[in-house]
Amino acid sequence: MAYLTRTAAALLATASALLTASPTASATPSPVLARESFDRLPLGPVTEGRDWTSDTSDGTLTVTPASTGHGRELRIRTEGNGRAFVVFPRLAPPGNSFWARMRLRVDAFPTAPDWAHWTLAEASGPDSPTLVRPLGGQYVPTEKRNFYGVGSDLGPTGDWTSWKTSAPAAAGKWSCVEFHLDAIDNRVTVYFDGVPQPDLTVSTDRHGGTADPFVFPTFDKLKLGWQLYQAGPSPSSYDVRMDDIALSTRRVGGCGS
């Protein structure tokens, strides 16, 4: 009887602990909105994965062995002014703010026509036509180089890319890129290999468009990939490699310093 009493007491104590334990740890939502390393996808052409689909025109997405020799990566290829994007269509970030991180390598940037404009990331939402392009750039003929810049289109501030000569776009080199979309002041910040790029920052009243305020839509979609907008570019085709995508309500890190 004493043994049964002790056993019953132990069971009651365990049950009490379970009932009174704070649910905070299990109830706290994960900061991660989406991840994709491509390691679990089959080699070859791909049109969708976990939490993402695709948007292509004169372009393809292909899972290939990683150039590092470990795992797999995504090869993005377009012809002319085609496009090929991984699309996260159900984003819904809390507070309309989020971080993104990815590794990417662009084999070659355009050298013609003058002012050729390209996009690597584009965020949008259903309540506004405004497209937010946190990662893109432009060929600047006066400098004979491509430069990164944050941009936008279709909204009150017009079509603009705020490229900066302090952010040259280097072809054939892997970079770890992060960007943060902060709805508090419609701020976009960019980091290369863990280093902030303050010259690329744009916000409500500091951007490259008209005098109107730059205002985010309510984000529900993010596209990552490549699009060049002008016809007849040189070179005539483009190859981009992308890997280790992470979208989160917090900075993911993993890019070095």
Show which residues each predicted segment covers.
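Glycan-recognition/cleft segments
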Residues: 116-153
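Extracellular carbohydrate-recognition regions
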Residues: 29-54, 243, 257
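Flexible glycan-contacting loops in extracellular carbohydrate-active proteins
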Residues: 201-240
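Localized edge beta-strand/strand-to-loop motifs within extracellular or lumenal beta-rich domains
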Residues: 173-189
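Short, aromatic/His-centered strand-loop micro-motif at the edge of beta-sheets
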Residues: 151-176
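Secreted extracellular polysaccharide-interacting domains
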Residues: 73-101, 158-164
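Secretory targeting and sorting signals
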Residues: 1-28
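Extracellular glycan-recognition surfaces and repeat-rich motifs
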Residues: 42-75
